[in-house]
Amino acid sequence: MPRINKNDNKIMRIFKFMAVWALSLLAVPAVAYNEGWKNPVVMSGQQSYDVGDPQVIKYRGVYYLYCSSATKSLLCWTSRDLINWSDAIVVSNDPIAVDGYAPEVRYWNGTFYMVTSPNGLGHYVLTSDSPTGPFKVVTENLYQEIDGSIFIDDDGQWYFYHAHHTGIKGNKMPTHTSFGTDVDLNACMNGQWTEGPGVFKRNGKYYLIYTGNHVLTNGYRIDYAVNTQGPIARYTPQAEQNPILISADGVDSHYGLGHGSAFVGPDLDSYYFCYHNMTRTSGRTQRQLDLDRIAWNGDKMMMLGNTTWMQDAPIIAPCDYFDRAEIGPDWSTNSGTWSIVNSDYLAQTSMAENAMAVFTPHAEDTFTAEFTMRLAQGETSGRFGALYAYADANNYQEALLNAAEAKLELYTCSQGVRTLTATYNLVGDFTPQAWHSIRLEKKDTRLKVFVDGLLRTTTTVGEKGGSVGYVSHSCKADFSYIALSPYVDGSGILDVNLPVPGILPAALCKEQSAGAERENFALSYGTCEVMHLKQNHWLQYNINVRMKLLYNMGLRYKSSAAAHVRLLAGDEVVKDNVLLPATGGAWAVAPINDIQLPNGRTTLRIEVIDGDVTLYEMLIKRGTATPKTYEDTFDTSISKIWKHTEGIWKAVDGKMRSPLYGKNVAGTLTDIGMTDYSVECDVTCTNGINAGLIFRTNNPSIGGANDDTTLGTDFQQGYFFGISNNAVVLGKQNYGWTTLASKNRAFYVNQSYHLKAVVEGATIKCYLNDEATPILTYTDPLPFISGRAGVRSHNCIALFDNFKWAPITVSSGIEGVCGNGAADLADGFDSQSPVTAYTLSGQKVCADRNATLLLNKLLKGIYVLKDKNGKAKKVIIN
């Protein structure tokens, strides 16, 4: 079928522009597509510093990163591309700011405002006329806890946010250096201390990102909430997605993720999120810098992380910093007097009525552009600003700042006739001699105009784009960083490889077949898109796979009748004829296990073999090739299978005794990929009754500053099946508690009960006392698809015995062999016969044209090989 891909040539055009600029000595060199970053990010001069609570701002095209550093000085680093960072720069030695917590900076009208909480003892505001300082304290202690953050809304009103024991608070700032009366924002994690707030606005929606609960716990994590009413209106936490960043399991020694900031990257369109992780080396706890992308599906935000492997470099929009002596061939000036000053900015020094400088590379018909300008010192009037949709000297459009009247003015020149089309007031104490920015977002015929990051208007323009540049009328003006990009409204994410493991929204396919349709899906605060596919339709994604492994997928979909799909990695079928049962029109998740993916960059395609299905998203997680069985009878001691232990657990009289609160999780990190299994145990409660099994457990953690098992009792992502005084209960824990099913039954202390949970796909069956019929059965519409197993007590001391956790397997009836190599294991198969490998549970892994080639592909594990004639052999690869 023909392929539909609206963005096929965009990135190639960007690289072409950049190669031309490198030859013409413009500011930004070409960046290779695969020269990216790997978390944690190590910046020059960082090694001796703690990098916590990072915040990034952009000023005149340069990114400035500020952070808590546990030093006597406040520091920042600078970068143009988010890859290459400067040495650490001391931005303040003010004695009041020693050990400043979470310094955050906002630029406004020529002044940089920093808010920080020295030693966590209340907030001070510092100011500077430079992003690199020196910042000086200009207020007394304004208090308001820690982790202060400032947001400026489109009307110019400033808002202040901060941490609190009962959740994030916000208030309207009377001035730039004072705080107002707090409002609770309904953003509290587990009813506990919540910190690290940050607010930004996108397409009329307010997004609040926040962190909890304690910086020194592995389960330090990030949630987000949304509202459409205002910066300090009541926010709605996005419970279905939260937490959006967590790594309590500590894969790659990466845990304790929290407190960061969102910002737009150098392609002018893609969002990024910088945050910190925790590491412990040589007995020292240190925070490190991490960076991941944010993807947008309509109004829905998705964090593409956390990642610990090399990611694609940020795409850099064609741009100019004027850091050279001559203007160069990429600029055309048709009036005025233009020159570069101090290799820093472009100056227009005449009083010409219509002085223009045109940036030769053309914008797309759909584009984002950024411009930086100021009125020259000593000037008080005139108009200056951005030139766009430039076709020739008689056909163009302008977005101008009127210095004398503090207005934004939009002009159109058509066939030599120039017309003022709209005027908008600029907010606040507008100072024309300070650096200001104009941002244009043009999508088809819709144009959004921002001044200093604030939306001034959304208007309708023609479909055609054109060149961009700078213009002044009857005044001298200076111009700085300019950039243009073919991306707008989140489209830039389609030209990078999406990280796997991770989440793939169906609508973020790079390519799609003809006939595959996008449909709007209503959210409580906006819309996103889903993909409707019928027979032979397909979607294809560019992905970046962490390593060659088996992976599990949770495919979220709906279908009125059964359908079948296949998955391809590159050109190879990795799953064929996968059944998607009918869902009756409701959303459900179909687990697809044991998908073998190569490491690095490849494509993933999903094809509909038959049926009619609507796809929402795909969650891909690490699998395991060799699911193990774990058992412990606690006869003389607790065995070494228990790898995550909270509180003090002891072997007592042939049983394992729990603390009053705590979790004990079996298995190693490789077992997190286990999907379908049973877990069972004898449980005796000795005081109070609230204990049982946990399964498909991910990211278990304690809570609070002192490894508090009470605070951490719900700190896991997984399921619980247990007993209480008067009921059996099945619950879902996602750093909180949701009851899924329960049944009344009386239970008594000092009496043993046998609990067993069998989880297969999205269905959980719970058994009591070896009864043949499950006492509870539940199918989760949004399940955890894999994870470890263990036990848990809650306000109850319990005794556990005869623990067993075993994968669900389908016996092949084939005798196993363990050979010395591929040739040995392949012996007995026709060398010309195609052979397919399956897991012991019957899932197809991959196929090849003969057994020797196939065996060379397989990871360590146990497989069943079958050829086209039905010959079969169980093989062990070690």
Regions found by a protein language model. Name each.
Residues 1-3, 815-878:
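C-terminal outer-membrane/trafficking sorting elements
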Residues 275, 371, 551-555, 602-608, ...:
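Extracellular beta-strand-rich recognition modules
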